[in-house]
Amino acid sequence: MMGAKVVTGRSTTQGLAQQHGGVSNVVETPFNQASCCGPVSWTSGCHSLTESRCSRLLYILLHVGASAICCLLLSKTVVERVWGKAHGIQMPSVLCAHLFGSSDCPVLSGSGAVYRVCAGTATFHLLQAVLLVRLHSPTNPRAQLHNSFWSLKLLFLLGLCVVAFCIPDEDLFPAWHYIGICGGFTFILLQLVLITAFAQSWNKNWQTGAAQDCSWLLGVSLATLGFYSMAGVGAVLLFHQYTHPDGCLLNKMLLSLHLCFCGLLSLLSIAPCIRRKQPNSGLLQASIISCYIMYLTFSALSSRPPETITFQGQNHTLCLPGRNKMEPQIPDTSVAVFSAGIMYACVLFACNEASYLAELFGPLWIIKVYKYEFQKPSVCFCCPQTVEPEDGQRSRARSADQETPPAAQVQSQHLSYSYSGFHFAFFLASLYVMVTLTNWFSYEEAELEKTFTKGSWATFWVKVASCWACVLLYLGLLLAPLLAPHSESPPP
């Protein structure tokens, strides 16, 4: 997780280059030039980053680029100004007749285009996830599929997107829509698991230090106060911006309910019956969850359609950020951009952390990450950097202090993160981005401008449900040990 650093080995070609001295210097340049299409790692010419970081960065850039293209194709303003087409970009009639035998062809913009681009990126990552399953060593030939052949992989990705555009709407939408919904919900659950594991690991880590040194107790207190302050300020701003004395009853009820959830989870975190089974349970983890609940509440309220009431013979729009008087309101695009930015940052966080934990704890990382107990505290406030071997499993370790560049590395024996898990997380992320941009269940008339400014009830209730799922998940983590009365509690 954040703060944990990785030491990875250099590629085989670089190791041979160092051993053979001058001869390798002549051969190294052609190999570096061919690395985009060949098996030589692209990072052989990148001495400031490790191979794993370079590969991960490039995949992130590919995903960001694909998501940006989806936004442009979904934007009615961009389509009208760039292509001058008010009803979307049409496929050339000659190509359309050749592929489909008629003039009824898929539109190259709008929600259909988003579905097709995301279908290409999702298939791209799913295929790599399958091909890289049970890969644990960077020296395995299959690791080159992840770290090399960049030009070929880019062409393959473009080819998948082109093939998706050749599929008629009636064949694509019915099945792919439900696949996207299932993948989107799965990715939401993955995010919730990660944020609860993040909160619990941070709390266990620093509470372990607080039991040994008072300075750690000060850090726990300051962090707890900081998160509760952010949650409180967020709640006040939400009441001020998204409620009105003459309306917005649903917003008021939702905010009040979620504040009650935060209070309930905080009380349970320090309840004596909970602390007997979980001595390290405390307000730090509850404050992090409370802060995340307020973010999910903001995300839900900013995604709902505005409320309109009649006052003195005039229609007035309420429940939008900005003015709190009985005056016409306009959508605030800055709030939409801020919400979209946080959403995508959470997407990238989930993809990277899931791949790291999958390699650190193995296939059952979702369960093992909650059971891990820290033996000594670390300034790194999240997950363990080293997991001891258990029942014959291999040991996986991360360096906590520095990351040595490739020029001074010894070849690593294990991956710093799970390549297969990384691609599967991006497969789910592609589906999540697809359904989020197209308003989940109401994708037919989706437009970028409406998605982030006018909202939809489908998106609103999905985000409310994700908030309630977060509450239930954390509540289950607190109460689950009580269901096993004969289990021994770990030492504080």
Curated annotation (Swiss-Prot):
InterPro entries from the UniProt entry: TDE1/TMS
Keywords in alphabetical order: Lipid biosynthesis, Lipid metabolism, Membrane, Phospholipid biosynthesis, Phospholipid metabolism, Transmembrane, Transmembrane helix
Pfam family, one: Serinc
Residue intervals passing through the bilayer: 59-79, 113-133, 148-168, 179-199, 219-239, 254-274, 281-301, 330-350, 421-441, 464-484
Any single biological process term in GO: phospholipid biosynthetic process
Subcellular location(s) of the protein: Membrane
Record's GO cellular component terms: membrane
Membrane topology: Multi-pass membrane protein
Highest taxon of source: Eukaryota
PANTHER family linked to this entry: SERINE INCORPORATOR (PTHR10383), SERINE INCORPORATOR 4 (PTHR10383:SF5)
Chain's role: Incorporates a polar amino acid serine into membranes and facilitates the synthesis of two serine-derived lipids, phosphatidylserine and sphingolipids.
Recorded family membership: Belongs to the TDE1 family.
Protein's UniProt name: Serine incorporator 4
Species for this entry: Mus musculus (Mouse)
